[in-house]
């Protein structure tokens, strides 16, 4: 009988310890959910959550490689390729290139700047971000809006094309990840309301086929914003964007494009690969996943510009 008080005391201690541990774990999970958002219902939960840009600092070999990029073309493309990336660029308000090349550069330069916490690179990125924010019209449109006559070496037409904006959307998403600048949330909310109203009469393929084939890039940012704001109209926009995007699921499951040479633009294919998986978060139809798995089995991904079927030759 003398053992009973000891057993009871030990049991009580175990309960208290377990309860404290459970509370600590719950608090940790709450902290994680506050700082690192997973998908909001009804989107499918993701197994991994991307950390904010700059939360991990490079050292050693990785730091050396990033510094080489900073000192090389990535950090100096505005000087090496000034005709396109210099002050005449349409994404800086100039009368030069208005299409994808400027946004493409900043898509790489911005994360490099904030990962290295390099003020010189940040100062180089900021004019592009600030011009983009300031360019937004009352109806939500942003970016260059004026087509100009041909000039050798510049892309001065299709200024209203959906595709270059998808690249700049990724830039702005990364900028928010690195800085938490809340202007970006309002910026995207207004733009996506514009898209929801405009896409029915001016679909993704209106100006060029690039936006239609790469609509998954647009869709990713729509879901990203939905996870922050919970605005239901974003789910409607997600369905609309998927409907207007090239049907990669059907291509992968039912057609022979991946076995034929020169059937697909390889960059479109590389970016299209993700669209069924991105949409699966909302649609949750297993065929979206099956399509991508089948595509991975069907293709030897080697191409200069256009797909080579299952041939390893690049020429």
Whereabouts are the PLM-identified features?
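Bacterial N-terminal signal peptides
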Residues: 9-17
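Cysteine-centered metal-binding/redox modules
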Residues: 20
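Bacterial N-terminal signal peptides that target proteins for export
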Residues: 1-8
């Amino acid at each position: 009988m003398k053992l009973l008080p000891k057993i009871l005391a030990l049991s009580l201690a175990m309960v208290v310890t377990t309860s404290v541990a459970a509370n600590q774990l719950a608090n940790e999970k709450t902290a994680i959910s506050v700082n690192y958002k997973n998908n909001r219902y009804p989107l499918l939960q993701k197994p991994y959550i991307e950390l904010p840009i700059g939360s991990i600092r490079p050292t050693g070999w990785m730091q050396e490689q990033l510094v080489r990029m900073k000192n090389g073309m990535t950090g100096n493309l505005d000087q090496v390729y000034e005709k396109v990336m210099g002050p005449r660029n349409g994404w800086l308000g100039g009368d030069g290139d208005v299409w994808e090349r400027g946004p493409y550069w900043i898509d790489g330069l911005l994360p490099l700047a904030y990962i290295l916490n390099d003020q010189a690179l940040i100062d180089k990125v900021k004019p592009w971000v600030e011009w983009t924010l300031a360019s937004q019209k009352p109806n939500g449109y942003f970016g260059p809006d004026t087509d100009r006559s041909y000039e050798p070496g510049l892309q001065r037409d299709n200024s209203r094309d959906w595709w270059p904006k998808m690249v700049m959307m990724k830039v702005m998403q990364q900028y928010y990840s690195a800085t938490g600048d809340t202007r970006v949330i309002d910026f995207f909310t207004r733009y996506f309301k514009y898209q929801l109203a405009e896409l029915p009469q001016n679909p993704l393929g209106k100006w060029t086929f690039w936006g239609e084939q790469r609509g998954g890039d647009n869709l990713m940012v729509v879901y990203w914003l939905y996870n922050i704001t919970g605005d239901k109209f974003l789910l409607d926009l997600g369905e609309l964007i998927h409907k207007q995007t090239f049907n990669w699921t059907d291509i992968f499951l039912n057609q022979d494009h991946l076995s034929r040479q020169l059937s697909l633009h390889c960059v479109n294919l590389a970016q299209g690969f993700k669209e069924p998986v991105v949409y699966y978060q909302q649609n949750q139809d297993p065929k979206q996943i099956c399509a991508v798995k089948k595509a991975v089995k069907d293709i030897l991904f080697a191409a200069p510009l256009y797909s080579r079927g299952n041939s390893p030759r690049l020429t």
